[in-house]
Amino acid sequence: IKLILDGSPQGKTAYLTEPYYKPPHSESESYKGYPLIPQKEVSKWVSEYADLNIPIIAHANGDAAADMLITAVRNADLKTDHRTIMIHAQTVREDQLDQMKELKIIPSYFSTHTFYWGDWHRDSVFGEDRAMRISPTRSTLDRKMPFTVHNDAPVVPPDMIRLLWSTTNRITRS
């Protein structure tokens, strides 16, 4: 089962804990995106599917959306290694990686974000510091956590060589 918890960082609809660097024109300076599903529903679905031993895959780009999945998994009564997967995990923080490791949540990074939207993330979406942390594969490796990387076709072409290059080099188009 795939739950979609938020939107995209490049569209400024990912659900964040800190405001966007430059919010959309129609939003205030405190705009942080928004969840697509309330926490209560996320927790209910994770618990129900865990009881049925059905793995959960959750689209979570923003760190606030990641918090929602972490909370739901923590509160669920997971009797087995459930292999919950967090799709995209673009802005997960260090403390979230620690919790994900503890709860065995596997991140699957959309790591070509650095190539396709890195400049936009730096200059408009997150600012320099947060943009440098997009898809934190090094932090994940340092924790000896399993993770995967993926393209999100048709959002970007299904080019595995560019995906691996982007994951290791983290260079923008410019």
Name each model-derived stretch:
Residues 31-33, 82-84, 122-125:
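Short, contiguous strand/loop micro-motifs
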Residues 1-63, 99-106, 111-112, 164-166:
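Metal-coordinating catalytic core of metallo-dependent amide/deamination hydrolases
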Residues 48-57, 77-83, 143-147:
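Short, surface-exposed connector motifs at secondary-structure boundaries
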Residues 36, 87, 127-128:
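Residue-level marker of alpha-helix boundaries and capping positions
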Residues 76-85, 92-96:
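Long amphipathic alpha-helical scaffold regions
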Residues 57-61, 85-90:
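Catalytic beta/alpha-barrel core
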Residues 66-77:
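Distinct, well-ordered alpha-helical segments
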Residues 91-174:
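Active-site-adjacent C-terminal substructures of enzyme catalytic domains
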